[in-house]
Amino acid sequence: MKHAENEYLNLCRHVMEHGTKKEDRTGTGTVSVFGYQMRFDLSKGFPLLTTKRVPFRLVASELLWFMKGDTNIRYLLQHNNNIWNEWAFKSWVESDEYTGPDMIDFGLRSQQDEEFKVQYDEQMELFKKNVLEDDEFSNKYGYLGDVYGKQWRAWKTTAGETLDQLKDVIEMIKKTPDSRRLIVSAWNPEDVPSMALPPCHTLFQFYVADGKLSCQLYQRSGDIFLGIPFNIASYSLLTHLIAHECGLEVGEFVHTIGDAHIYTNHFEQVEKQLAREPRPFPKLTLNPDVKSVFDFEMEDLTIEGYDPHPAIKAPVAV
């Protein structure tokens, strides 16, 4: 029987073989395709990739951060999650208040210049310390703009009100499960210019059939090697959490990607991953005593039977 992880591995192969070379915002360069879809049956295991280790702890803490409506990296740092640091750090080193060493193009330079990387690491550690310990600094430079959490939980209307899209869609699933409007959008054109990183995973829709909850994500832009594995696990986890509250079983996670790309400095890592054989997906267990998705904490989420191949490191394009 075909392993479900091949949905992802086939995406990697397809882009490596048929992708178009493109320049990008980060200056790194990519090969990409436009319009690709993967499907995962969540009843047959939790799709946490096994051909490389994907840190579930980071996936879960980021999702809980989104669900809280938080847009400041302090919560993530408190949970030893550094995946959003570079975007907040960028706003700090580009500000008039920053007086440290030149950090222009720190993403690429830290990969190419060992001496610079020492300076970069020192400045990043200092930045993280200030976000954690200095409220004023955190409020100013730990903030990422109106990113996912804000749009999910407090979408601004032209009337000056706010919409809690996530709470509303959960209520709709309970009351009108056959609705075709079970949608949450993170793409607010008015707010995009002020965001540290405009939403890559832009819109998701739920579908209820035969007592099962399915979710489809439309992702405008997908970093196949680093980002997509997180996105698969994150939205699969979100589907499990909402199904739990609504008294439903889990159905499918359908992942539709607009610009699906592999960065040119990830080719070697992708080839290494493609040479590995998938292992059985793990099982996700939720604390049955927690009834609302908004009450889940890290200790309420457990992954069992996860035996992946080793992690494969790769640089982040900022």
Swiss-Prot record:
Pathway: Pyrimidine metabolism; dTTP biosynthesis. The keyword Transferase applies. The active site is at C200. Keywords: Cytoplasm, Methyltransferase, Nucleotide biosynthesis, Transferase. GO terms for cellular component: cytosol. Pfam families: Thymidylat_synt. InterPro entries: Thymidate_synth/dCMP_Mease, Thymidate_synth/dCMP_Mease_dom, Thymidate_synth/dCMP_Mease_sf, Thymidylate_synthase, Thymidylate_synthase_AS. (6R)-5,10-methylene-5,6,7,8-tetrahydrofolate binds at D223, A317. PANTHER family: THYMIDYLATE SYNTHASE, THYMIDYLATE SYNTHASE 1. Catalyzes the reductive methylation of 2'-deoxyuridine-5'-monophosphate (dUMP) to 2'-deoxythymidine-5'-monophosphate (dTMP) while utilizing 5,10-methylenetetrahydrofolate (mTHF) as the methyl donor and reductant in the reaction, yielding dihydrofolate (DHF) as a by-product. This enzymatic reaction provides an intracellular de novo source of dTMP, an essential precursor for DNA biosynthesis. This is Thymidylate synthase. It comes from Bacillus anthracis.
